[in-house]
Each structure stands twice: as structure tokens, then as C-alpha cells.
């Protein structure tokens, strides 16, 4: 707990132990307090038109549940605070309602139509004030209520509220709408006003004393409503207790006023700073205007100078271009003649060459077609031979498969017959019912078999005795027939082979020679085979003949090419060479000429390379100097400005450094003088500040101690003494002149030990500050001082001070002297500060010049060296141009010699061919031989394979195998006889097998079962053999079909390829060309050679045509260029003449106005026209803005924008210079040059800015002052809370015997106050920062001393503003004295319901009283506001507690509206009995009003 809190506890204990005193809240006012007179409800639920007269103290609404008590109070609250965002009558809101319901308990209390809730009050002035609201239900599901507030004034006392709001319509009354109510009082003395905002409505009520506090915002309304709600529902409201600071503690204005004073002084100082900034803006305008004007005009000035120089160069170049165009035109005309002649020659040769090329191309196509046909023929011959072989193989395989099919068919038929016979036997046996029948059946079958054998064999006498003999006989015949069939098969096979060979040989002969008679096939085959040997021999010679013909044709072609080349060479070289000796001699001559020209050209190239190197070196030097030249000119300009500023002429860099050193010494001396004057000025300011204090004290701690001890400074008591007496009293008290006068020294003595910060010597004098005398010392006044008898053994002599502490008049007189002296010292300080600033600026310029331009400023002029380099470069360019012409002539001679040598290199190897005259005949003879060989070769290639196959089988053609058909018939007949004999053998075998059955004629049937089994086994065996035979037959047939299909495919393929082969042979015969690989190569090389020659001819002709077109176009262009060059030259010459006239005018104007040196900025001469125009355009844009307010400069600038008159820009620059010269304040700046004026303005403004900035620091409020103000405010409010506690000390509710308010300073904020007071140096970085406001610095300090506290998302400015409010430093709580527990925090959980209601009501009474005192200054002095609180359900209070409330109301002159059940009847005040009744299906509330009936 801090010291302040301990002091507060001590004062609280003292007040509680003292005798009861009358509360400060009940003074004897001469002004009566306003009172609420009545509440009127119109068209509410149960109250159509009811007025409740309110008692001056307590009005009680008594009734049962649902009688309308809460509705009445709701009407009162609604009229008092018509804010739908706040109103919420909880006890009537439906249970479980959600936020979606907007009723808030009000909608259900109203009836349909217009409703009113009106309050009538009588204020301190005796005025009748009627305020209220019009309510109306809004149709819809949200249960909205529309509220409109209004007021009435000057209403006579005789008019009732009901008569005002209703009108009589027959026997009924009608509620007037708000518009009709307004119309009713239009033109009368009654003032009707409708309010569109709740704030205006409450402002009216506050001004007339209806409510205790001005409710400016929704937050204030919320506080007021929460106060009413807390009183309405009773108890200790947590909403109120948690924010008692906002309800009880008024807003502090001390710190705000201090900050306003500080801001006022700072505002004045900053206005001066703003004026300085305006002057700085003038300075900036000076600087901006002169800079932009210089850029604008000088860039255009240098651009015109460059353009003038460039125009002269362009004129010279155009004249040179004119002459060059003439020479080029003559050269192109000569080229046109030469190229036209060559094109004519090429056109003559092109047609013949094109015909040769077409012929060669056709021959190549024929050869290639022949080769392709030959390849196809060979491929098809191979394929046909291969297919024939496959066809023969397939034919043999097919015949074998056919025989297998026939054998399988016969075997299958026999198997079928055997199976059918066995099945018939089986069926017969099955029909027998017993063995006897079976045997009989077998016997019958045996007889049938015997008959069958007789018929089949033709033996009618066949029986069991001779059956075996006949079987043996027929078996022998079968063997003989089998041998005969085998023999016929062999003969048939041999005959078939001979037939096959004959057919094959005959087919081959037909393929070679075509269709011939079979009888003449042998002769034709013999002749073909005889010629085949010679043809093969002749075909082998075709390769050698072909090679030989290729060589001859190649030599013949080379001979023709040599003749062509020789003709071309003679034509181009203008010679008539025919022999090899002549050509070789000319070749050696041209080779020697080529070597001479190459040597001469190499020498020219070397010389040119050397000259180009020299030119590159000169260009590099020139470019380097050109880069250095702008910086050199800039350095020269800076040197000139520096010499003007320093008044010195610098010859070398050493002189600049020496002057810079001297300037440093001068600056040091001026700085020492300025600092001495500053110290004197600060000392005078300190004296003036001390004497300006009300008490003249220079120690602020004395004021704090005086406030803490409750005393007054001695100097304040003597503040009104005269000037003559002031020295006497100052000397009388001596060192005790800073003493503090207190009422009781003993009461202060206990606090002295607790002092932490106080002066070394603290004097305390006991006395009454209101009646203090000087009888403290025994003194005697002397001439120069006072002798004071401190004690019998100690005297003190004090001289009269020159500046007495006592007496405001004496201090003010001395203040005038000090201020005059300070003004003089300040003026001297300003002069010295100006000198220091000037030295510093000059030193800054020197440093900048040394760092930037010193290395170049004293070097020679680079432009002179550039002129020398330009002259050397021009001479080298002339020599290079001359060498280029000579080089071109040599290269032409070199190209001509190389072309001739190239043609001779092609001709010389072919000279020997030119003398061979028989080459063409030999080539023709060889070609004829080759044709014959190629025919034989083609025949061998086509039919060689057939003849090779024919040769081994040709002998088969001698005899035709015509008896093959007869042999085949014999074979078939023998095979049929063999089959008949085999059937007879089988029938006889069957009879033999059934021999036993013949004995069954009379046998018993004991053997039938065995016979059946035997037949079944034979049947199964026969069926298996039949299935096997059928499978073999199907396989054989499938194989036969497959082989037959393959054979058919091979035959069709062979026929197709044979036919294609015949067609290819006919086609190659039609072509008439026998192609081979060499023929194709020869034809292709011939075609390519002719194509290349033709392409070369055409390319050359195309090139020449293009060149002719180009030359013609070039001639036209050159002709136009020549005319244009001549015209441009004359135009440029006129332009140069005109520019010279304008330039002379510009020079004359600039030289006469002495601005040429500022415009002729040589560093700009090295920039391009676009860059200079960009500089000028940017400056023009800035100047348009800068001179927008100056009509003269604006017009001059507009005139200068004419690019045809550059002299107008110079005139504008002169006008700007003159304008700035006129604006220079000669009383401050001693120069006529605007640039110098800018420099002096910068120095002066910098000094003024520094002085005002330091003054602003002095004006800023200190953290210590803020801490003192906060402490005083907190102490004052603690005392006020103590006074409020006196009004609560005699309150008792049940076991509660006392209620009090406890106020404490928060520990974190107490630490902050201590840091503000004592940590000035420690936290200097925060409050001396220029970047932080005082509020932000305060917040940062709070965070620094309380690092454990989180600031959240709030800004330091917001936190700092909260920390300037003293209420945030305090914690305010309510405590009750209850039984043996003593003083404890008031909480609803620790108190009974009645005690909580009484305690809460007591607190609310104090809040209302506090609000009245807080708003006293804002309210008229003749107005005391009404006081009224509510209490619903007062049954929770006993009679004693209710009487206590009555006493509180009487003591505090306050009204109270209570709702109680029927069994509660207060003894005093007005009581209304409310009973809800229903009459004629209409519900209403019956009201009976009584006064004090409880006593009876």
C-alpha cells in the first residue's frame, strides 16, 4: 500500500471515530428542489387514461400479482429514458426468449393504437414541465415499438395531462396522435416540441432540472439506465459496483487544462515555426525557381548552340553528300550498260542449253524406268520359278492325299456294312425270347448268309461241305487281282511321271516361244537350247562393252565441255586462243599478275590497319576527354561560385586547402563567442523563470511539501508587499525566506521522518496563514541590512538583496531589467550564430568542392586537346578514304585475274581432248555392240531360268504319252474286280464263321446268351473300327481340301505373276532402252551437269536482272537523292543563316543582361538534344506550377515556350532574376544576387529553427508536473469520498450497521506516479524524444515500470490518454459493517436480500448526489434537479428497512417509487392500491390512492 493510501486510511479512521456530524450532502439551500408531480399512462394495458400523483417522498404501488405495478414503473422508465436499445423489462419478458425477440417487455404492455407515457414535474423555478413519449405498436412478427419523445411548456396548472392528450367524442374519449397534439397548440402560448434524438430530449430535461446529469452520449444514457435498473430490481448491482469510478468520480480537467496551456504555448511556438517554414518555402521557392529557370533556359540555350553547330556540320555533310551522289550516279550508269550487254549474251545461250537439259532429263527418266522394269522382271522371274516349284510339290502331295481319301472311303464303307449286318443280327437275336429262339434266329441268319454267298458268288450248289474250297479259290483270285492292281499302279505312276515331264517341258517351251504345236515342241526346244549357249557368252561381254562406252561417252562429254569453256574464256578475255601452248603462256602471265596485285593489296591493308589503329586511339582519347569535359566545366563553375562566396582567387588546390583551414579557425572562434552568449542568455532565462513564479521559489518540491503539510509558502504570504518593503522582509527571514507556514508543527513532525525528497534545509513556521504576522524574530534595521536576534547567543545579519524574493512588484520591476538585458544578449547571440552558420555553410561548400571537384578544377581545358585530336582524326579519315578507293581498284583487278585463272584451270586439263576427232565414231560403234549384248543379256535374264529347267527334261518331248488314259482305265477296272472278289471272300468267310449255327436247327437254347454276348462284342468292335475309319476319312478329306486350296492359290498367284512378267517384258521392249547402273550414273551426271550449267546461267541472269532492277532503282533513287541533296543543302544553308541571326540576338541579350555565364553551361554541351529537351521540359513543368500565381512571370513563361524565338527564354530568365532580386529583403540579406540571397536565407533560417526548437523543448510540460497534478486530483477526490461516507455512516439495514466507500490507488499506477516524479533522468529518453508525444511517452513508461502487464492491441497513444485520467489510478469499492464480521466487501452473496437492497439503494443515492455536484457548474444556479429512484417488489424489506429508506429520502430530499404486495402498507407517503378487474369482457386496473393509511 502506498503512502497516499495509508494517509487515506488514517483520515478514514479519524472520521469514523469522531462524533457524528451533519452530512455535507444536505446543506441549507435557499433554492427548492425540483419534484416529479405525476405519471400519466394513456392506452396502456389496463390503463386507458390514468394519472398517478407522485408523493414528495415515497409513492407506493400496492397490489397482487398482475395488478399492473411493473407496467406503471415501465411507463415511468420509458418516459424517462426512451431508448429502445436499453429498455429491457426482465420480469415480463417471456421465459426462454432469445435475441430474435425484440419485445424487451414493452410491446405486451401496450394496446393497439397511440399510447403515451408522460411525466409532469415542477422545477426549482416553479415551472411546470411536461415530458413524455408517444408509443405505438408496429405491425409485424418482430413486435417492434415506435417511440417519439416530446415536451410541453407553459401549460396552465389547471389543465390535466389526460385532457391534453385526449379529446371527448360523444360519450367516448379519443387519444390524440402526435401530429394532432402539435396542431392543437399551434399559435398558443404552450410550447410543443418533438425531439428527433434522445440527446436533445435529455438536454432539455437537464436544463430544466428533470434529470441530475447531462446525458451527452449513449454511454451516459447507459449509465443512467443501469442506475435506474439497479434501483428498480434492488440489490447490489454488479454493473454499478464494478464501474463505481465512472459513476462517482468526475472527469478530471486539471491535466487537460495543463495540456491545453502547454499546447497553446506550443501552438504559438509552432506558428512561428510555420512562419519560418513559410520563409523556408520562400527560400525553397527562390532555390526552386532559380534552379528550374536555369535548367529550363540553359538547357535550351546549349541545345540551340549545339544545334547551330550541328546545322553547320549538317550543311557541310549535305554538300559532301551532294557531290558523292553525283559520282555514284555516273558509276551506276556505267554498271547498267555492262550488265545489259551480259544479259543479252546469256539469253542467247539459254535456249539451247535448256533443250539439251530437257533431252538429258528425258533420257535419264527412260534409263531409270528401264532399270526399274529390269529389277521388277528379275524379281518376278525369281518369284515365278519359285511358285512353279511349289506348284509341282503341291500337285504331288495332292495326288497322295487323294489316294488316301479313296482308301479311307472304301474302308469306311466296309465298316458301315459290317456294323449294319451285326446290328441286324443283334436285332434278330434280341427278338428271340429264349435261347431256343436265339439259336433259331442264328440258324436263320446262317441260312441267310449262305444264300447271300450263293447269290454273290454265283454258286447255287454252295453248301457247308464245299464252302471252304470256294473260299480258298476266291481268296487266291483276290491275291492275284491284288498283285495285278499293284502292278497297274506302278505302271500308272511311271506313265504319270512321263506325262508330267512332257507337260512341264511343253509348258516351258510355250513360255519361251509362245503357243506351238505339241508335235513341234521338241524341235523348238532343241533350237532354243542350241542358241542359249551363244547368248550366255554374248551376255557376259555386255559389262565390258558398257564400261567401254561409258569411258568413250565421258571423254566425248569432256571434249564438248572443253570446247564450250574455251569459247567462253575467249569471249570474256577478248582473245582467240586455240592451242595448249597459247593457253599455258597466258596462264603463267595471269598468275604473275595475281601475285603482284596481292602483294600491293596486302601493303594497302597493312597501311590502312595502322591508320585505323591510330584513329581508334584518337577516338578513345577524344571520348575520354569528352567524358571528362562536363565534369571539368562543372568544376570550373563550382570554383567560380566558391571564389565569389569566399572573395578569394584560387590558383591551385593548395590555396583552397589553406583557405579551408583558416575558415575552420574562424568558425571555432565564432562558436566560442556564440556559446558564451548562449550561456548568458540561459542564465537570464532561468532568473526570469524563477522570478515569474507566483512565489518566486526555484524549488518545486516546496510546493509539494506545502500541499502535503496543508500549509502555505512564506513567500506567498508576502507576495503583496510594496517594492520598498520587499528587501526588508527578504533580509528579515534570510535563509528562512523559503519557509512553509503550517497551523501545527506537532502534526507535521510525524510526517518529517517519512519524507524522501526535500530540500537540504527545510524551514517550518507555525502560524495561521490567514492571519500571519512577522513577530517571529527580534530584528533591528540598519542602513544596508537587518540584524536578527535568533537567540541570546546567536545573531544573524542579512543585507538587503538586490532582487528580493518577497513582493510581486519588486520581482516584476527586476524582471523588466532582466528581459531588456536578455533581449540584448539574444540579439548578440543571433549575430554570432549567424556568423557561425555562415562559416559552417562556407566550410561545407569548401568540403564539398574538395571532395567532388578539386581533382579536376585546376587541370588544363580538355576542349583544347579535343580540337587538336579532331584535326588529326580528320587528316587520317581523308587518307583512309583515299586508300579505300585505291583498294577497291586493286580488288577489282584481283577478282578479274582470279576469274581468268579459274577458267584456265578448268580448260588446261582438257586441251588434249580437243585434238581427238575419231572419238565420236568409236563411241557410236561401241554403242551398237552394247545394244546387241544387252538384248542377249535381257533374253538370258528373262528366259535363262526356263531354259535351265528345260535342258534336263527336253528329251521327254520326243514322245507324247497318249496311252496314259487307257492304262488308267485298266487300273480302275482291275480295282473294281478286286473289290468284287474281296466281297465274295468276305461272304464266304461269313458262312464259314456261321458254320456252327447250321447245327442249331434242333439244338436247345442253352447257348443263346453266349451267342448274344459274342454278337455284342463283335458289334462294338465293328463300331469302333467304323468310327476310326470315319475319322481317318474326315482327316483325309480335310487334308485334301487344304492341299487343294493351297494348290489353287499357288496356281492363281503363278498365273498373275506370269502375266505381270509378260507385261513388263513388253513395256521394256517398248522403252527401247537397256538400262544398267553405269547408264543411270552417266545419264544422271549428264543431266546434273546440264542442270548446273543451266542453273548457273539462270542464276547469273537472275542476279543480273536483279542487279539491273536494283541499278535502275538505284539510279532513280540516286537521281532523287541528288535532287533532294541539292535541295536540302540549299535549305540547310538558309537555316544556318537564319539561326545565326537568332543566335546573335540571344548572345546580345544575354551579354547585356550579364546572364551569359549562367546560361553558357559547357557541361551541358556534351548531352544529346533529347536529353537537353527532357531537362528543359521537366523544368518547364515545374515552372508552370511555380509561377502559376505570378501573372507577369506566367505570361513571360508562356511566351518563352515558342521554340521559334529562343530569345524569349533568355528574356524569361532575366525576368525571373529581376523578380527574385526585387523580393530580397535588404534589411536581412545584404546582397542583390538571388543565389547569394538563397545562401544567406538558409543560414538565417537554420539559426531561427534551432532557437525555436529549443524553446519548444522548454515549453513542453514536464512529467513531474503531470504527476503533481494527478496526485492533487487523487487527494481531492479521496477527501470527497470521505465526505460522501459521512452521509452513509448512520445507515442500517438488518445486520448491516454501516456502509462506506473505500478508494485505493492501484499499485501499478502508484509505481508510475513515483517514476514520473523521481525518475526524470532515468526515463529522459522517453520524454525528450521528438518522435513520441507526451501521451505515448507516458504509456511507454507505464509499460517499462510494469513489464508484467500486457497492453493488448491498444496503441500507446490510447493508453497514454487513459493514464492522464486520474480515475484509472483508483480502485473504488463498497464495504459494509455487518455483525461480528466487521467491515467487509459488499457482495450480494454475503448479505440477505433486504440488506443487499438497502445497501444498493444507499450506494445509488450517493451516485445521484455525486452526479448533481459534478454537474453543478453546467447547470443554472437557480436549478436543483429532481431526485427519484425506484424499488420493485419491496416485500423483501422489513418495516425497519423501509423506514430507513424513508429517512434517507427525507434527509436527501429524494422521491422514491416502490412496488409492494397488498400486505405491505407504508405508514407514510402515498399508496396506490391496484386491482385488475374484468367488466363486460374488458380488462382494466382499478386504482385507489391513499396517504399514510398504515397508521390506522
From Swiss-Prot:
Residues 694-811 are annotated as: Flexible hinge. This is Chromosome partition protein MukB. The hinge domain, which separates the large intramolecular coiled coil regions, allows the homodimerization, forming a V-shaped homodimer. SUPFAM superfamilies: P-loop containing nucleoside triphosphate hydrolases (SSF52540). PANTHER family: CHROMOSOME PARTITION PROTEIN MUKB, DUF4476 DOMAIN-CONTAINING PROTEIN. It comes from Actinobacillus pleuropneumoniae serotype 7 (strain AP76). It comes from the Bacteria. ATP binds at residues 63-70. Belongs to the SMC family. MukB subfamily. The lineage of its organism: Bacteria, Pseudomonadati, Pseudomonadota, Gammaproteobacteria, Pasteurellales. GO terms for molecular function: ATP binding; DNA binding. Homodimerization via its hinge domain. Binds to DNA via its C-terminal region. Interacts, and probably forms a ternary complex, with MukE and MukF via its C-terminal region. The complex formation is stimulated by calcium or magnesium. Interacts with tubulin-related protein FtsZ. Plays a central role in chromosome condensation, segregation and cell cycle progression. Functions as a homodimer, which is essential for chromosome partition. Involved in negative DNA supercoiling in vivo, and by this means organize and compact chromosomes. May achieve or facilitate chromosome segregation by condensation DNA from both sides of a centrally located replisome during cell division. One of its GO terms (cellular component) is cytoplasm. It is found in: Cytoplasm, Nucleoid. Residues 1082-1101 are annotated as: Disordered.
